[in-house]
Amino acid sequence: MIKLIVGLGNPGAEYEATRHNAGFWLVDQLARMGGATMRVEGRFHGLAARARLWDQDIWLLKPSTFMNRSGLAVVSLARFYKVLPDEIVVAHDEMDLPAGAAKLKRGGGAGGHNGLKDISAHLSTQDYWRLRLGVGHPRNAPGGAGAGREDVVNFVLKPPRREEQEAIDAAIDRCIEPLGLLARGDAERAMAQLHTTR
């Protein structure tokens, strides 16, 4: 069962269209589907809404703390509504997957993602679900960009190219049905369906 879906990103118009905000894009799509309006919730350090999705009430959250402090928002809402870590899905950008790919997994390390690191620290566990939305990697980008720290930061804080954006949007659409399966407690089918469709 899933009770909370968190999308990671950075607040502000200047970041809205950047690769790092792929998690926000997924949550926005779910809010539209569930007829929910994301509202500023100071006690949860972000925008939150309760949406009716897959015949269940599910909290949606977009932290407004900036990526590296996302854990504060997640733990605030989770504690208030008594949501357990394994009832949380965190959707985030993933450079180790090409644009248009999506993978679902439970637990594991942060893979260098500072938002995940902070969430794990605040929850005192890594045992929550992650929906990894591929955005590609600078070493594979046209123009021969490198893979140093500065290249990575510049890459995730820029908008994807048009064809990449279309691929990411399509991946988000493909995630909806598997998320519904996961929300209803069928994790095995959710992962099988997401990982075999493209």
UniProtKB/Swiss-Prot annotation:
SUPFAM superfamilies: Peptidyl-tRNA hydrolase-like
Catalytic activity: an N-acyl-L-alpha-aminoacyl-tRNA + H2O = an N-acyl-L-amino acid + a tRNA + H(+)
Enzyme class (EC, first level): hydrolase
Active site (UniProt): H20
Record-annotated site: Stabilizes the basic form of H active site to accept a proton: D93
Keyword Isomerase: no
One GO location term (cellular component): cytoplasm
Keywords in alphabetical order: Cytoplasm, Hydrolase, RNA-binding, tRNA-binding
Binding-site positions, tRNA: Y15, F66, N68, N114
Keyword Cytoplasm among UniProt keywords: yes
GO molecular function per UniProt: peptidyl-tRNA hydrolase activity; tRNA binding
InterPro entries: Pept_tRNA_hydro, Pept_tRNA_hydro_CS, Pept_tRNA_hydro_sf
Family under the similarity heading: Belongs to the PTH family.
Name the UniProt record assigns to this protein: Peptidyl-tRNA hydrolase
Species of origin: Cupriavidus necator (strain ATCC 17699 / DSM 428 / KCTC 22496 / NCIMB 10442 / H16 / Stanier 337)
